[in-house]
Curated annotation (Swiss-Prot):
Keywords: Disulfide bond, Pheromone, Secreted. It comes from Euplotes raikovi. GO terms for molecular function: pheromone activity. GO terms for cellular component: extracellular region. InterPro entries: Pheromone_protoz, Pheromone_protoz_sf. This is Mating pheromone Er-22. It is found in: Secreted. Coiled coil: none annotated. The gene is MAT22. Mating ciliate pheromones (or gamones) are diffusible extracellular communication signals that distinguish different intraspecific classes of cells commonly referred to as 'mating types'. They prepare the latter for conjugation by changing their cell surface properties. Disulfide bonds join 3-18, 10-32, 15-24.
Amino acid sequence: DICDIAIAQCSLTLCQDCENTPICELAVKGSCPPPWS
């Protein structure tokens, strides 16, 4: 899904999308560049 893609690619746009998806927030944190790391 989009959050798996965000984690794999560390795409800022996808990280922003996942940031608004509570179930994905913790998965994205630490896997994406700042400010999502």
